[in-house]
A protein has these predicted regions:
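Acidic, serine/proline-rich low-complexity intrinsically disordered regions
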Residues: 3-268
Length: 268
């Protein structure tokens, strides 16, 4: 499996409205300069760069491009000020009940430990080099399917952590980068404002080391988990991309014969 093929597969097996986004950190200036993607010519919040990439935009970013102080802190492109580190900053805005809780949020967030000279943010399918992180923002159903694909090879997902704050920069990017494991986010008010995510969208961050097995896991769990209506769409998308659709089996699910009483009935 290669990157382009993996994107074709995931976009066939999931009905995505946005393309998966790849994030690559550069710690060598010469390598960053040689990476043939235009550098952003003005500031942008990191989360909005991810949103733009999910719609096809590719860009490189340095600390001068950072339009959000919290995103820059997560990416080690700005020092964490003492009021943020000790919890007083967020407590002053009435986000948390007391100083202990507020400080615990800062203590438990995992930011980059080394400052990158730059970052590439672009559609995953554009990469030839391996990115560090893959981000998918979609509806809860598709994120469920990604987690099921992860579970196929990895079992129960026990590490998911989120608090509705620093959703794209920390939940999906730096936490995933540090732990080398997947994480989800329900997003946060800040990114929903500046990146204009839809109300029904949530996200998942995936380390590249797990990407191919997750794609394969989504494929392998299609027949037990997807219903006939969704299978029809998958089959159609596979064929449109010239991919093999012969493994799609209808009228077959993991819970066949498990339920009594049928679906809930509603009266008009």
């Amino acid at each position: 499996m290669d990157i382009k093929y993996s994107v074709d597969l995931i976009e066939s097996y999931l009905d995505l409205d946005r393309t998966p986004v790849g994030i690559k950190f550069f710690f060598d200036w010469e390598e960053f300069e040689k990476f043939e993607v235009p550098q952003r010519d003005r500031k942008v919040t990191y989360c909005n760069s991810v949103q733009l990439a999910s719609r096809g935009k590719a860009m490189k970013l340095t600390k001068e491009n950072q339009g959000c102080p919290n995103g820059a802190m997560a990416l080690k492109m700005r020092e964490v000020p003492e009021p943020m580190a000790n919890g007083k900053g967020r407590l002053s805005k009435n986000i948390y009940h007391n100083i202990e809780i507020s400080k615990s949020i800062s203590d438990e967030m995992l930011f980059l430990e080394e400052e990158p000279v730059g970052i590439a943010v672009m559609p995953l399918e554009n990469y030839e080099l391996e990115p560090d992180i893959i981000i998918i923002v979609s509806n809860p159903y598709n994120i469920m399917r990604v987690i099921q694909g992860h579970g196929y090879f990895n079992g129960y997902t026990s590490n998911l952590r989120t608090v509705g704050l620093q959703a794209v920069c920390q939940d999906l990017t730096t936490y995933t980068y540090n732990t080398k494991d997947i994480n989800i986010t329900l997003l946060c008010p800040g990114t929903r404002l500046v990146a204009n995510w839809q109300a029904n969208e949530i996200g998942i961050g995936i380390p590249f080391e797990k990407w191919y097995e997750i794609v394969q896991g989504v494929k392998e769990t299609t027949n037990p988990f997807e219903r006939n209506k969704e299978k029809e769409g998958i089959q159609k998308r596979l064929r449109e991309r010239g991919l093999d659709a012969s493994n799609i089996r209808f009228n077959e699910n993991y819970d066949d014969g498990s339920y009594s009483g049928g679906k809930i009935e509603t009266r008009g």
